[in-house]
């Protein structure tokens, strides 16, 4: 069986020219050949910003680029038919499709309602700082451009827990809506800001049974319409775990698919929170390993001062590898984004080796690391910046190595602050498999490592071409392997036939 590898096929600043669905359709065969087994596509539903929407400012779940709404028929990425054609092409190439689902909030309501709210302290949302009073909020959604096709469900204030704008006074604040489903916010895992149920826009009220049923009905429709194989669930930190337990169980039952699910619970450096969420969802979904990403970023910033023996300390992949999706970057951590924490370019080849060539975790590569990216935006300081993200050196070879070479027993040599390595013995199923990986964040390094007696007498070379040596494996399956300074080498049999 081939090792699984995900590609996130978008980034926040992908051009809004409607080309993405067409591009993945063209690229699918090449990506499958390279070694990718699943493609994570961006949110396909119409956002309130129309063609300018990256998909997370969700307006209409049933509009996949089909209806003239928010000043456009297509989304940023293309039309509904182009989306379905792209999914067909990905499937034809032998890969799976993971769709990005935003069920935390809705944006761009069609009509304002007069609703009763209490204002809360933004830093402690459990503290009410006003008596109940009326505001005007855009909480009515009836999707006039769709005219009831696929669903005639009308969303109103009873479908939401909170909003952040009073259209009457034009005041921006966080308002808890008084409805029939409790005195305040929904119960979520994180007590950051007192209660972090509210994130943005109109926050969906999953305590309302009509809302839960509509979201299940939509999930069925979406799966039947597109045939996706898995889901990436946005902002699960802000949604009660009980909702996704119910939703995922329902979806798997009615679709007869054990489809893959990964949640975005971004809590860098806070492994206990990730584990708490995994306990609450009882293993129904994987999570992105925000803790490992935190370590990779720190390693890239600290250079030789970072102790590489600690790279997997307090990470999800170390304690729950079967539910860990490992990443080097994503659309939230890229430069100028809300959770900006990019891994510096010099360290990225090492970071990708750490997620792609080891036995644990389900790695996910990021679009700009394969294709590069260039864009402009304002930073947190209000100034405009031009960003260039170069493609990562040797990333295609590293993905290919995961596909062809990184199999069999793993032996770790995480024993030096500036130079660590591991070996994979290889197996009979994958011809020519087996490797020795060595990386250094300081000077040139070397390490004696065992690749297994099955390789005795073979000559190993650096698959990445970063080190010129040729290494002979001794009768015990061992050899001394080398790596250049601030670099990674992947040693493989010269003759892998």
Where are the model-predicted features located?
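Substrate-binding cleft of carbohydrate-active enzyme catalytic domains
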Residues: 75-109
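Active-site-adjacent "subsite" loops/lids of carbohydrate-active enzymes
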Residues: 182-225, 236
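Core domains of carbohydrate- and sulfate-ester-processing enzymes
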Residues: 119-195
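Active-site-proximal helices and loops of the catalytic beta/alpha 8
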Residues: 2-4, 26-32, 36, 45, ...
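The substrate-binding groove and active-site-proximal loops of carbohydrate-active enzymes
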Residues: 8-19, 58-80, 197-212, 229-238, ...
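Residues at alpha-helix caps and immediate loop-helix transition turns in enzyme cores, especially N-
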Residues: 20, 82, 243-244
């Amino acid at each position: 069986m081939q090792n699984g590898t995900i590609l996130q096929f978008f980034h926040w600043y992908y051009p809004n020219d409607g080309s993405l669905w067409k591009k993945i359709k063209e690229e699918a065969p090449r990506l499958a050949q390279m070694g990718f087994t699943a493609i994570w596509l961006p949110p396909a539903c119409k956002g309130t910003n129309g063609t300018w929407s990256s998909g997370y400012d969700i307006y209409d779940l049933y509009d996949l680029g089909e209806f003239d709404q928010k000043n456009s028929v297509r989304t940023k990425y293309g039309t509904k038919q182009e989306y379905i054609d792209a999914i067909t092409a990905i499937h034809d190439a032998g890969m799976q499709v993971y769709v990005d689902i935003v069920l935390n909030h809705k944006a761009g309501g069609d009509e304002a309602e007069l609703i009763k709210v209490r204002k809360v302290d933004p830093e402690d949302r459990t503290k009410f700082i006003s008596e109940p009073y009326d505001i005007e909020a855009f909480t009515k959604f009836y999707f006039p451009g769709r005219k009831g096709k696929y669903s005639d469900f009308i969303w109103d204030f009873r479908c939401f827990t909170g909003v952040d704008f009073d259209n009457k006074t034009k005041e921006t604040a966080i308002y808890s809506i008084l409805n029939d489903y409790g005195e305040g916010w929904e119960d979520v895992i994180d007590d950051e800001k007192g209660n972090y149920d509210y994130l943005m826009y109109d926050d969906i009220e999953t305590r309302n049974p009509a809302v839960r049923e509509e979201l299940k009905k939509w999930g069925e429709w979406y799966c039947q319409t597109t045939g996706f194989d898995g889901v990436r669930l946005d902002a699960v930190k802000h949604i009660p775990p009980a909702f996704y337990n119910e939703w995922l169980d329902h979806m798997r039952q009615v679709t007869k698919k054990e489809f893959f699910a990964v949640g975005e619970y971004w809590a860098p450096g806070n492994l206990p929170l990730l584990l708490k969420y995994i306990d609450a969802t009882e293993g129904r979904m994987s999570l992105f390993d925000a803790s490992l990403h935190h370590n990779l970023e720190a390693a890239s910033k600290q250079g030789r001062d970072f102790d590489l023996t600690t790279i997997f300390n307090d990470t999800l992949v170390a304690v729950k590898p079967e539910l860990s999706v490992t990443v080097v970057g994503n659309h939230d951590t890229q430069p100028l984004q809300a959770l900006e924490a990019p891994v510096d370019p010099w360290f990225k080849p090492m970071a990708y080796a750490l997620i792609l060539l080891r036995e644990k975790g389900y790695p996910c590569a990021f679009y700009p690391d394969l294709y590069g990216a260039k864009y402009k935006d304002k930073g947190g300081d209000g100034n405009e910046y031009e960003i260039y993200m170069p493609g990562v050196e040797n990333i295609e070879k590293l993905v290919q190595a995961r596909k062809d070479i990184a199999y069999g027993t793993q032996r770790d040599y995480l024993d030096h602050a500036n130079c660590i390595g591991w070996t994979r013995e290889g197996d009979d199923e994958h011809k020519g498999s087996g490797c020795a990986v060595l990386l250094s964040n300081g000077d040139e390094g070397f390490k004696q490592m065992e690749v297994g007696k099955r390789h005795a007498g073979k000559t190993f070379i650096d698959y990445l071409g970063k080190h010129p040596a040729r290494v002979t494996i001794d009768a015990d399956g061992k050899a001394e392997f080398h790596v250049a300074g601030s670099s990674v080498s992947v040693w493989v049999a010269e003759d892998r036939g």
